[in-house]
Regions:
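Alpha-helical scaffold elements that line and support the substrate/ligand-binding pocket
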Residues: 20, 63-93, 125-131, 200-203
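Structural recognition of the beta-strand scaffold that forms the well-ordered cores
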Residues: 16-22, 64, 101-104, 119, ...
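Active-site Gly/Thr loop motif
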Residues: 99-101, 149-202
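Short, gly/Ser/Thr-rich active-site loops of penicillin-recognizing serine hydrolases
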Residues: 213-217
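Active-site-proximal binding-pocket segments
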Residues: 95-152
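A short acidic/small-residue loop/turn micro-motif
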Residues: 209-211
Length: 217
């Protein structure tokens, strides 16, 4: 609350973690995705910057893709666990998967960027996909709860046309794919991991595509 302005938007205090995870915070526009996140010229304090934004839409009522939602969600988790996201994920996920500590961009306050900037090899992307394909189990150890895997892959919003690979639906930080039961993690410029539970399959690709996503499809 030390980052709140003196007269915050009434909807701001209604935002919950679940709203941030499914891109329904209510900010109604993409934030911390362009110049406002550019090193040296962007917002010097992401939390303070976001707390000052208007929230014209009721949280949870409408989808609007924005890196700011993921960034704020990561900050919320950090407060809950008392650790930076990099440390927490390394302990709970990356180390058990023998992934090491990934290169990850940080914001001006030193927080790992919850909205992107994590550099992984294709093999590491496949490992994370395999973890979710196995309902959170890795070599007999339950790394992530089955309930959470089910929750993140359940659509919170669905879109038309349903045949469009990029606009089928959205769960918790995962896009819903058109194949039955499938969902995927998308990274910038065509870094994609798709989990297809009914096929027992994970597909990961890395691609330097910057605009024509039909080529990625």
């Amino acid at each position: 609350k030390d980052k709140l302005p003196s007269n915050p938007d009434p909807n701001l205090e209604k935002i919950q973690l679940k709203h941030l995870l499914c891109m329904s915070s209510g900010f109604d526009k993409a934030l911390l995705m362009n110049e406002d996140r550019r090193p040296g010229v962007g917002a010097p304090d992401y939390e303070k910057y976001m707390m000052a934004q208007p929230v014209p839409v009721e949280p949870g009522s409408a989808f609007c893709y924005s890196s700011a939602d993921s960034i704020l969600a990561a900050h919320m988790v950090e407060r809950a666990v008392g650790k930076r996201m990099g440390e927490y994920l390394y302990e709970k996920v990356f180390q058990p998967l023998d992934m090491g500590w990934p290169l990850w961009e940080h914001d001006p306050q030193g927080h790992p960027n919850g909205g992107g900037g994590m550099y992984l090899t294709c093999t590491e992307m496949m490992k994370l996909g395999q973890l979710y394909l196995a309902e959170g189990n890795w070599k007999g150890e339950q790394i992530v709860s089955r309930d959470w895997v089910q929750e993140v892959s359940t659509p919170k919003f669905t879109f038309e046309p349903s045949a469009d690979l990029w606009h089928v639906g959205y769960g918790y930080q995962f896009w819903i794919s058109p194949y039955p039961g499938s969902y995927r993690a998308d990274g910038a410029f065509g870094q994609i991991t798709t989990i297809l539970p009914e096929k027992g399959l994970v597909v990961s690709i890395q691609c330097p595509e910057r605009g024509n996503f039909d080529q990625v499809k």
